């Protein structure tokens, strides 16, 4: 956050005081300003970041080290990042390639027609696997199919694959930081899927919190700009977000 000059076009004269990458803006927008805060964005892919404070942590578990943000005159804050390329894109694949659903949001009701995945598991490696595996040769796969498997099982398996990938990202972060996250902050289009969010909470055994404003990237960079102009401490970011919904784990340890 700094004074980068003024806009020359569109709205001439408007000062530019914050420039953030997509996921860094989401991290700040989720008020992840303390070491150990962690968020995951559920969009076309999944992108998890955890604030590591002023410490540059080099991952031994397949994650990337990145700058989180820096306010002019202050030390930079760093983060660990894990990314998976296919999350919501797998739902689009069900819709556009297999014609199993008409609209992306239909996947939740279809998946709920079955009580579980029927032992069907999906690996959405359409473009290889990113964090923490980094295997460009991996390809998508469906496992556990029987003559009793149906499209509801497939829908549930696709949703669960998103949660399993996120589990791997957070597990890698916890190993690198030698910690155990208490909760996860979430944003992105797939947060509207209650079945996915509950399953995510269940397998992580952690509470999950969404925000009232789901366009968290825009919120993050907008508030960052405002805080710099008004010379306000970064801790006041909490004044601009409101928790929307919380999912708590409801799965037995045996099942997990």
Q: What positions do the PLM features span?
A:
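Conserved glycosyltransferase catalytic-site signature
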Residues: 20-25, 44-45, 200, 215
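Contiguous, well-ordered alpha-helical segments that form the cores/surfaces of helical PPI scaffolds
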Residues: 25, 47, 220-224
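Glycine-rich nucleotide phosphate-binding loop and flanking beta-alpha elements
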Residues: 27, 34, 46-48, 86, ...
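Glycine/Thr-rich phosphate-binding loops that ligate phosphate moieties of nucleotide
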Residues: 52-256
């Amino acid at each position: 956050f700094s004074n980068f000059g003024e806009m020359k076009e569109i709205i001439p004269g408007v000062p530019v005081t914050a420039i953030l990458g997509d996921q860094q803006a989401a991290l700040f927008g989720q008020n992840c300003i303390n070491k150990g805060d962690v968020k995951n964005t559920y969009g076309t892919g999944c992108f998890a970041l955890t604030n590591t404070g002023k410490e540059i942590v080099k991952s031994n578990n397949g994650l990337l080290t990145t700058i989180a943000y820096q306010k002019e005159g202050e030390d930079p804050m760093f983060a660990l990042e894990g990314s998976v390329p296919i999350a919501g894109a797998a739902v689009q694949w069900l819709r556009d390639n297999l014609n199993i659903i008409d609209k992306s949001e239909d996947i939740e009701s279809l998946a709920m027609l079955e009580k579980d995945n029927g032992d069907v598991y999906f690996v959405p490696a359409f473009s290889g696997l990113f964090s923490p595996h980094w295997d460009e040769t991996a390809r998508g796969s469906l496992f556990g199919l029987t003559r009793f498997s149906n499209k509801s099982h497939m829908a549930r398996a696709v949703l669960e694959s998103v949660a399993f990938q996120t589990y791997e990202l957070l597990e890698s972060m916890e190993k690198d930081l030698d910690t155990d996250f208490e909760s996860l902050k979430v944003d992105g289009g797939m947060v509207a899927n209650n079945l996915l969010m509950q399953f995510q909470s269940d397998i992580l055994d952690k509470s999950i919190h969404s925000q009232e404003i789901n366009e968290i990237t825009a919120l993050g960079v907008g508030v960052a700009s405002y805080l710099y102009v008004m010379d306000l401490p970064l801790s006041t970011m909490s004044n601009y977000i409101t928790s929307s919904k919380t999912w708590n784990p409801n799965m037995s340890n045996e099942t997990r």
